[in-house]
């Protein structure tokens, strides 16, 4: 297969994994587009994206326009004469003139099985909803939000111990192989595009810190799903004794309770059992303010008086 001249557009580490795969392939990455450097860390020092750092380490030209809606930026991109543009978590809207510029258009690596979970947080929303599988879709981009024709899909079962962090890692391994396979099919003309079924589409909204507050009136199963979805960000939490306590790991208990939602049923080094709107949730790992995440056994050693049976959590809001 003849090598393709590729423009790569992406920003975070997930995108950098895909760029590395392209660099390692026989294709030519002729330019990289990434978000402008942003202030980061305590010193708010301007910091390059992982994609920019990787590109510069391989002497690949880097472009960082604040927008691709203006003609000078569009002309600059067109002058590169790329065969195709590969977009992975770039973070900028591509107008139609940009989508139509490369000979083979623009393709996107998306972290869900489209048309389910279009949008910004597909990995997290799959966990949040209790989905049994996720995957990667390689899509021909159009002007809609993740609405383009699907070129290739891979599938990944979601395990009970998966979190957003672990799924992110698994999809970051699966995605690059799918991308290379799709590029080969496009170059050879052997890929058959599949339209998305709009009746199956839904939207993966961004997560918010407010959403991560545990609502004990929900079912234990839903709360377990949320804790996994919000790990490592924004991390589920509840308020107690005037403090915000983060929850990193839970499991659904086999015990039952008629106590009011948010009531501690039992507290031992194996876990803290909390009554919910349906079932009992066992807290396994938590984080006190200013501290590192700890097992419940260590939490009880430090603050056992906070978590005695019959105590109500989030009681300030009830």
From Swiss-Prot:
Family matches, as InterPro entries: Fmt (IPR005794), Formyl_trans_C (IPR005793), Formyl_trans_C_sf (IPR037022), Formyl_transf_N (IPR002376), Formyl_transf_N_sf (IPR036477), Formyl_transferase-like_C_sf (IPR011034), GART_AS (IPR001555), Met-tRNA-FMT_C (IPR044135)
GO biological process assignments: conversion of methionyl-tRNA to N-formyl-methionyl-tRNA
Its job: Attaches a formyl group to the free amino group of methionyl-tRNA(fMet). The formyl group appears to play a dual role in the initiator identity of N-formylmethionyl-tRNA by promoting its recognition by IF2 and preventing the misappropriation of this tRNA by the elongation apparatus.
Organism: Shewanella oneidensis (strain ATCC 700550 / JCM 31522 / CIP 106686 / LMG 19005 / NCIMB 14063 / MR-1)
Keyword field contains Protein biosynthesis: yes
Keywords: Protein biosynthesis, Transferase
Annotated Gene Ontology cellular component terms: cytosol
Enzyme Commission identifier(s): 2.1.2.9
Binding site for (6S)-5,6,7,8-tetrahydrofolate: 112-115
S-S bridge residues: none
Reaction equation(s) it catalyzes: L-methionyl-tRNA(fMet) + (6R)-10-formyltetrahydrofolate = N-formyl-L-methionyl-tRNA(fMet) + (6S)-5,6,7,8-tetrahydrofolate + H(+)
Protein name: Methionyl-tRNA formyltransferase
A GO MF label: methionyl-tRNA formyltransferase activity
Biological classification of the source: Bacteria, Pseudomonadati, Pseudomonadota, Gammaproteobacteria, Alteromonadales
Family the UniProt entry places it in: Belongs to the Fmt family.
């Amino acid at each position: 297969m003849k090598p393709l001249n590729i423009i790569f557009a992406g920003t975070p580490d997930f995108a950098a994994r895909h760029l590395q795969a392209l660099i390692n392939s026989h294709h030519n990455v002729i330019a990289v587009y990434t978000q402008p450097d942003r202030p980061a860390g305590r010193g708010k020092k301007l910091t390059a994206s992982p994609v920019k750092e990787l590109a510069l380490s391989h002497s690949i030209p880097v472009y960082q326009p604040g927008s691709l809606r203006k003609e000078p930026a569009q002309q600059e991109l067109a002058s590169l004469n790329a065969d195709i543009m590969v977009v992975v978590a770039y973070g900028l809207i591509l107008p139609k003139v940009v989508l139509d510029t490369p000979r083979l258009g623009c393709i996107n690596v998306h972290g869900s099985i489209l048309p389910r979970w279009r949008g910004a947080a597909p990995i997290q929303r799959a966990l949040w909803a209790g989905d049994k599988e996720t995957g990667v879709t390689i899509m021909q981009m159009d002007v809609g939000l993740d609405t383009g024709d699907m070129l290739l899909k891979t599938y990944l079962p979601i395990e009970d111990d998966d979190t957003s962090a672990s799924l992110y890692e698994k999809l970051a391994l699966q995605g690059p192989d799918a991308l290379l396979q799709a590029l080969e099919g496009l170059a050879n003309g052997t890929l058959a595009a599949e339209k998305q079924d709009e009746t199956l589409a839904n939207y993966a909204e961004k997560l918010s810190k407010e959403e991560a507050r545990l609502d004990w009136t929900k079912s234990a199963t839903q709360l377990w799903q949320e804790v996994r979805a919000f790990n490592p960000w924004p991390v589920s939490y509840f308020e107690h004794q005037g403090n915000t306590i983060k929850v990193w790991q839970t499991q659904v208990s086999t015990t039952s309770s008629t106590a009011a939602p948010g009531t501690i049923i039992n507290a031992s080094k194996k876990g803290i059992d909390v009554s919910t709107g349906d079932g009992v949730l066992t807290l396994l790992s938590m984080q006190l303010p200013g501290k590192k995440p700890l097992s419940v056994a260590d939490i009880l050693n430090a603050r056992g008086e906070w978590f005695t049976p019959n105590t109500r959590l989030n009681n300030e809001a009830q």
